[in-house]
Swiss-Prot record:
It comes from Syntrophotalea carbinolica (strain DSM 2380 / NBRC 103641 / GraBd1). The gene is gpsA. The active site is at K191. NADPH binds at S10, W11, K105, A140, R255, V279, E281. Keywords: Cytoplasm, Lipid biosynthesis, Lipid metabolism, NAD, NADP, Nucleotide-binding, Oxidoreductase, Phospholipid biosynthesis, Phospholipid metabolism. Pfam families: NAD_Gly3P_dh_C (PF07479), NAD_Gly3P_dh_N (PF01210). Catalyzes the reduction of the glycolytic intermediate dihydroxyacetone phosphate (DHAP) to sn-glycerol 3-phosphate (G3P), the key precursor for phospholipid synthesis. This is Glycerol-3-phosphate dehydrogenase [NAD(P)+].
């Protein structure tokens, strides 16, 4: 299969490498022409995945039209806040039967839309019928190292889901199917907010009890938002919900948890972000999730406190105190 991968961050590079290893003809698009030249010469992405040599047959380009044109499949791995613009540029070049796979995690700040809703606004209906959404508990470095990993692909068309499942799966990468697009997407986006909170808790030295409470109650908030958007509750118990949440809240490779750790230790958000090359989606997603919950009329106390910490400069210790002193209630809604 002839595949284009749009986005050469750590995850896009890893997926392109995996697909090339799986025997497909893959071209990886990077915005930076100088990065493309270096990848061609060294078979390494020295900016975002420097410790791994990429598959020898993987091709590279900074020409978006070239990467999108005539492909059987195009994988979208651009950051969520720029995905709309990138897809608009790529769409005129796509073949009629191209399968689109979104592997971007996030909620668009301006519209409060998950990526599937963004694509609905920029793509014709016939293209949306051939779209799928990939999400789950994945650190790019571990997949690049061929460490066993499982995740979920969601599509309205089961045949498309089966095709994507088959193309991506290999001895170390197992893909499950779902038809709950919104649930799979929201799990991958909202867990980043809870990971920031878990990192703050760890940075404050609050220990494992507090982290477990945040993960569990955070999952409840994610599920409430999802159900309000007509996602299936059980989806949040799966790989794209609980699985991704646990990984991102506990794994040392989590960028969002790392940002939270530094906040808990007293560093300023702007100082933390200025020293990061890769995107921590959770910061922007916190704003979107907070506004989305307000719009939906959903109670999300952890997300609300994260908004106050990140955007209103609330002291994290005060936020924890306010969470602990809320009115007492039953655990299950």
């Amino acid at each position: 299969m002839n595949i284009g991968v749009i986005g050469a961050g750590s995850w896009g590079t890893t997926l392109a490498d995996l697909l090339s290893k799986n025997g497909h003809a893959v071209t990886l698009w990077a915005y930076e022409q100088d990065l493309v030249e270096r990848m061609r010469k060294s078979a390494k992405n020295d900016l975002y995945l420097p410790d791994f040599t990429l598959h020898e047959k993987l091709a590279y380009s900074s020409d978006l039209g070239e990467v999108a044109a005539g492909k059987d499949m195009v994988v979208l791995v651009a950051p969520s806040q720029v995905l709309r613009a990138v897809v608009r540029q790529a769409e005129p070049h796509l073949a009629k039967d191209t399968i689109l796979v979104s592997a971007a995690k996030g909620i668009e700040n301006d519209t409060l839309m998950p990526m599937s809703e963004v694509l609905k606004e920029v793509l014709p209906e016939e293209r949306l019928q051939r779209a799928a959404y990939l999400s789950g508990p994945t650190f790019a470095r571990e997949v690049a190292a061929e460490i066993p990993t499982a995740l979920t692909v969601a599509s309205e068309d089961e045949n498309i889901a089966r095709t994507v499942q088959k193309i991506f799966s290999c001895e170390y990468f197992r893909v499950y199917r779902s038809s709950d697009i919104v649930g799979v997407e929201l799990g991958g986006a909202l867990k980043n907010v809870i990971a920031l909170a878990a990192g703050i808790s760890d940075g404050l030295g609050y220990g494992y009890n507090a982290r477990a409470a945040l993960i569990t109650r955070g999952l409840a908030e994610m599920t409430r938002i999802g159900v309000a958007m007509v996602a299936r509750e059980r989806t949040f118990m799966g790989l794209s919900g609980m699985g991704d949440l646990v990984l991102t809240c506990t794994g040392d490779l989590s960028r969002n948890r790392s940002v939270g750790l530094e906040l808990g230790r007293g560093r300023k958000l702007e100082d933390i972000l200025s020293g990061m090359r890769m995107v921590a989606e959770g910061v922007k997603t916190t704003l979107s999730a907070y506004q989305l919950a307000k719009r939906l009329g959903v109670e999300t106390p952890i997300i609300e406190q994260m908004y106050l910490i990140l955007f209103e400069n609330k002291d994290p210790r005060d936020a924890v105190a306010d969470l602990m002193q809320r009115s007492l209630k039953a655990e299950m809604d």
